[in-house]
Amino acid sequence: LFAVIIGLSIGIGLPMQTAINSRLRNAFSSPLLSSMTSFTIGTIFLALVALLITHSLEIGVDLIKNQPWWIWVGGLLGVIYLTGNILLFPHLGGVQTVIMPIVGQIIMSMLIDNFGWFYSPTHALNIIRILGALLVLLGVFLAISAQKLFSARKEIISDNSLLQNSNRNSQWFWRIGGIVTGMFSASQTAINGHLGTVLNSAVKAAFVSFLIGSIALLDNCRGC
């Protein structure tokens, strides 16, 4: 039950995070600068928490050498996910910016569980999992249909119906982008989960992920 409450709390926080970071984008006029600000603050916070809990941020050289290369790319996937959401928000709005990545997360999570990627425990696909995924897809369809119905009513009193039709068509590009970023997010979760096992600390794993993401963003934001 406690894990369910934590999961729900994280889910509630995601739309707020996306909205806040989108406002940051308006302030900095750059999605990368917005992401870098978010990651930098997160890195500092996680460093303090990790120091309080583990009393060290050190990672052994042998550990770095003996682990697969992909264990360190979780932060890069997080950068793609966060920056992608910032780009999606003005095109899809709050609801679809949240639900489209969820579709990608479910698809990728089922693949990761079924094949045991990233050293994850294997959970074969069964009818319950498939039905659950179909219910989520049904919810996504209903949410998109509701927005289309609302847009159609607005077109009745608008002279810009051709422009709105063009915008609706372009939304599918962003929806697919949302699904892809969601798949990256699910991969990041699995990778960081294994990193947490290796480091024997979930907080330190989160810190490492954020630190790598911050460094990548800093390198890409030199010309911003």
What are these regions (language model features)?
Residues L1-L8, N114, F118-I179, M183:
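Juxtamembrane helix-loop boundary signature in multi-pass membrane transporters
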Residues S30, G84-M100, T197-S201:
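Structural motif at transmembrane-helix junctions in multi-pass transporters
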Residues S34, L88, F115-W117, A205:
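Hydrophobic/aromatic residues within transmembrane alpha-helices
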Residues T37, M100-P101, I128-L131, V208:
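Hydrophobic core positions of alpha-helical segments in small-molecule transporters
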